[in-house]
Design a protein with these regions (language model features):
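Short, basic, glycine/proline-bearing loop/turn elements
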Residues: 14, 83-88, 116-119
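Short, flexible loop segments at the rims of nucleotide/cofactor-binding pockets, characterized by
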Residues: 14-20, 42-43, 88-92, 123-124
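Non-catalytic C-terminal accessory region of glycerolipid acyltransferases
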Residues: 97-230
């Protein structure tokens, strides 16, 4: 825990040297800082997305990040991720132990970051929204905060020194994330996923970087007409 508070300011400084950040919707972020359970649900483009969002949230409790197990195979990367609050999950294997651990921490007011797509989409477009974030939010009675991370590069991907825009959307209250009718569980989950997708798409539509202006091709120079000889 101590390493988290040592590393976080260092990472913040390094990140602000290498990239140019703009944060929008801080007032929406403040709504989850009252001790309530909350789940942060961002889109996912680059491996450093969780780090960028973590240094932006800078919560007084350590933010927990759900990350794929493969990222921990490198000893140095694994150490860094654990210090930053990341928890490894075995994808596709029904890792109920990790899910239960995160749910219990979330109930106690710890923020949980889960990428609802479950993987990166390098094009910047949203992939398929999965159910994991909603399962934990429903079990913990947590609010959900949609977050859109937008890279200001030509291809929409992360590059050194590019602009990065992190947009916090409007809170989705816990009451709207409860599965009230278990006989229609799949339909309820589909409704929630569509709601989150709509929120994330709207955040991009409202806050996308302006497309670079295309220079008009110069008009061909017209030669003076020759006068006719008598």
């Amino acid at each position: 825990m101590l390493l988290y508070w040592i590393l976080l300011p260092i990472v913040w400084v390094l990140a602000h040297i290498l990239w140019r950040f703009e944060v929008i919707g801080r007032e929406n972020l403040r709504t989850v800082r009252d001790g309530r359970a909350y789940v942060i649900a961002p889109n996912h483009i680059a491996n450093l997305d969780p780090v960028f969002i973590a240094i932006t949230v800078f919560d007084w409790k350590r933010l927990r990040i759900l990350a794929k197990e493969e990222l921990f195979k490198n000893p140095l990367a694994g150490w860094f991720l654990r210090c930053m609050g990341a928890v490894a999950i075995e994808r596709g294997r029904g890792d109920t132990t990790t899910v239960e651990q995160l749910t219990n921490e979330c109930k106690n007011g710890t923020g949980i970051m889960i990428f609802p797509e479950g993987t990166r989409t390098k094009t910047g477009k949203l992939g398929m929204i999965k159910s994991g974030a909603f399962v934990i939010a429903a079990a913990a009675g947590a609010d959900m905060l949609p977050v859109r991370i937008i890279y200001g590069s030509k291809d929409g991907r992360m590059h050194l020194f590019c602009k990065i825009r992190i947009v916090f959307g409007t809170l989705i209250p816990a009451e709207e994330l409860q599965i009230k009718d278990q006989s229609h569980k799949m339909a309820e989950l589909r409704r929630m996923k569509n709601r989150l997708r709509d929120e994330l798409e709207q955040l991009l539509a409202d806050n996308a970087f302006a497309a670079p202006a295309v220079e008009a091709a110069p008009e061909p120079e017209q030669l003076p007409e020759k006068s006719e000889q008598p």
